C-alpha cells in the first residue's frame, strides 16, 4: 500500500494537499490519531484499498512523540511518503486573519509555566513549530509561504507520481531580499555573479527569457559557479542516498530571485535530469503564477 503522510504547520496548506490526493484517488483522513494509523492501514489493505493519505498535526500533540518510531515501522511495510508543509510566521498570521479561523493551539497551556495560556496567534504558531519539528527530518519539506493553492496541488501531484526508489531533487531559485526558503537542505549564494538587473533591457525579464540566458551563458564566471555546484552535488548525492534520503532541496539565491538564480537552477536541473527525479521551482521570479508548469516544472529526462 502507498501511504502519504501530510504533516507540518497549521495554515500551511495541509487541507489543499489532502484534497489534491483525494482527487487522485486516495482514501483521505484528516487529523487521525497517530496510534490508529497502523490498524487503519491494515484494514484498508485487506479491503483492497491501495492508496491512503493521512493528515496529522498538533491537534494530535499527545501522540506526536510516537510518530518517529511509527514512520520507521510503516516504511518497512508500505510505500510511505511524508510531506512536511511549512510557511513563514508572517504568512501564517495573514492566512489565519483572512479566514478568521482559530489556531488549534490558541488558548492551550504553554510549555513555560511563567507564560500560562498561549494568548497570541504568534505564540501558538511557534509552539506548534516546536511540537512538529522532529517530523520534518522524515519527509520532504515545502515552504508554502508564497505558493498559491493551485501551484501546491500541482507540486503534490508531482510528489506522488515520482518513483519511490528514486531521489527527488528540487532546485529552488529565490531572492535573499524576500528571505531564505524554509525548505532548503542546501543553499548556494550566487550574488557574486554579474547581475542582469543593471541592464535596463534585461531588468523586466527573468532567467527563463532568452536575452537573459544569452547574457549569463556568455560569462565564464557563471559557468565556473555552475560547475562548482554541480561537482559538489555529484560528490555528495551518493552519500545522501546512503543516508536513505528520498528528497533533497537545493536552493539557489540571488538578490531578487529573478535572473541569476533562475538561470542557474534551470541549468543545474537539466544537468541532473538523468541522475534523479528533478523538479525546479522559481519562488520569487515574476512569472505567471497560474502557469504552474513554469513555476513548478518537472524537467524532462533525455
From Swiss-Prot:
Q: Entry's PANTHER family?
A: RNASE ADAPTER PROTEIN RAPZ (PTHR30448:SF0)
Signal sequence residues: none
Q: State the name under which the record lists this protein.
A: Nucleotide-binding protein Bmul_0520/BMULJ_02739
Give the residues the record marks as binding GTP. 57-60
Alphabetized InterPro entries for the sequence: P-loop_NTPase, RapZ-like, RapZ-like_N, RapZ_C
Give the top-rank taxon of the lineage listed in the UniProt record for this protein: Bacteria
Binding-site residues, ATP: 8-15
What GO molecular functions are on record for this protein? ATP binding; GTP binding
Which keywords appear in this protein's UniProt record, sorted alphabetically? ATP-binding, GTP-binding, Nucleotide-binding
What family is this protein classified in? Belongs to the RapZ-like family.
Which function does this protein serve? Answer: Displays ATPase and GTPase activities.
One Pfam family it belongs to: RapZ-like_N
Amino acid at each position: 500500500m502507498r501511504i502519504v503522510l501530510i504533516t507540518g504547520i497549521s495554515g500551511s496548506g495541509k487541507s489543499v494537499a489532502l484534497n489534491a490526493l483525494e482527487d487522485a484517488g486516495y482514501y483521505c483522513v484528516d487529523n487521525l490519531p497517530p496510534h490508529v494509523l497502523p490498524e487503519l492501514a491494515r484494514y484498508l489493505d485487506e479491503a483492497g484499498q491501495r492508496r491512503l493519505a493521512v493528515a496529522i498535526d498538533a491537534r494530535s500533540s499527545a501522540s506526536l512523540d510516537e510518530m518517529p518510531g511509527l514512520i520507521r515501522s510503516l516504511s518497512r511495510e508500505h510505500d510511505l511518503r511524508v510531506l512536511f508543509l511549512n510557511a513563514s510566521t508572517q504568512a501564517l498570521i495573514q492566512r489565519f486573519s483572512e479566514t478568521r479561523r482559530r489556531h488549534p493551539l490558541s488558548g492551550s497551556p504553554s510549555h513555560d509555566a511563567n507564560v500560562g495560556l498561549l494568548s497570541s496567534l504568534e505564540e501558538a504558531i511557534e509552539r506548534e513549530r516546536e511540537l512538529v519539528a522532529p517530523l520534518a527530518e522524515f519527509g520532504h519539506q515545502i515552504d508554502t509561504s508564497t505558493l498559491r493553492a493551485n501551484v501546491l496541488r500541482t507540486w503534490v501531484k508531482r510528489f506522488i507520481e515520482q518513483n519511490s526508489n528514486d531521489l527527488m531533487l528540487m532546485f529552488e531559485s529565490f531572492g535573499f531580499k524576500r528571505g531564505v526558503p524554509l525548505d532548503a537542505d542546501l543553499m548556494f549564494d550566487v550574488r557574486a555573479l554579474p547581475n542582469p538587473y543593471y541592464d535596463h533591457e534585461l531588468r523586466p525579464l527573468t532567467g527563463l527569457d532568452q536575452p537573459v540566458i544569452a547574457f549569463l551563458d556568455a560569462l565564464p564566471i557563471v559557468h565556473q559557479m555552475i560547475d562548482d555546484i554541480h561537482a559538489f552535488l555529484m560528490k555528495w548525492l551518493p552519500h545522501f542516498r546512503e543516508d536513505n534520503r528520498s528528497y533533497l532541496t537545493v536552493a539557489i539565491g540571488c538578490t531578487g530571485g529573478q535572473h541569476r538564480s533562475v538561470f542557474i537552477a534551470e541549468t543545474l536541473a537539466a544537468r541532473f535530469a538523468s541522475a534523479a527525479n528533478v523538479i525546479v521551482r522559481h519562488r520569487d521570479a515574476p512569472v505567471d503564477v497560474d502557469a504552474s508548469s513554469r513555476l513548478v516544472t518537472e524537467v524532462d529526462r533525455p
